[in-house]
Amino acid sequence: MFMGEYQHNIDIKGRLIVPAKFRELLGDNFVITRGLDKCLFAYPQEEWKKLEEKLQTLPLTKKDARSFTRFFFSGASECELDKQGRINIPSNLLQYADLEKETVIIGVSSRIEIWSKSEWDNVFNEAEESFADLAENMIGFDI
């Protein structure tokens, strides 16, 4: 399971160091794609396959399903770690998530999320302020 928060910088070649604790779980080859809230999602191959199978069950007749799967899959890219534990993030994904230098990499159960530090600070502060309300809303999910 991925968990924790780490800060790293993207170098001038668009490479990002993946935290050592995440490398083994991600494996040598994994998938990175556009996430929600202007971040990137990265999935180990096994988790990506599970997600892909679920998304393939969405009805093609639903416009939202078509739009979501187009957006999600068109941004997907297979990545691999180099010998220094870095990934080269495709330029379209760097642009989507406004990633320039300072990043925050967080573990979220079955995936990691890659955020620009400024965007993460905004999202985190907003969640922190409303955490009690968020927790109350999760009661219906048996958490």
From Swiss-Prot:
Q: Does the keyword Repeat apply?
A: yes
Could you identify this protein by its name? Answer: Transcriptional regulator MraZ
Q: Which Pfam families match?
A: MraZ
Subcellular location(s) of the protein: Cytoplasm, Nucleoid
Q: Which residues form the SpoVT-AbrB domain?
A: 5-47, 76-119
Q: Which GO terms describe its molecular function?
A: DNA-binding transcription factor activity; transcription cis-regulatory region binding
Top-level taxon of origin = Bacteria
The record's PROSITE patterns line, in alphabetical order, gives: SPOVT_ABRB
Which organism's genome codes for this protein? Listeria welshimeri serovar 6b (strain ATCC 35897 / DSM 20650 / CCUG 15529 / CIP 8149 / NCTC 11857 / SLCC 5334 / V8)
* Family recorded in the similarity comment: Belongs to the MraZ family.
Write the record's keywords in alphabetical order, separated by commas: Cytoplasm, DNA-binding, Repeat, Transcription, Transcription regulation
Q: How does it assemble?
A: Forms oligomers.
Q: Does the keyword Iron-sulfur apply?
A: no
A GO CC annotation given for this chain: nucleoid
Q: Which GO terms describe its biological process?
A: negative regulation of DNA-templated transcription initiation
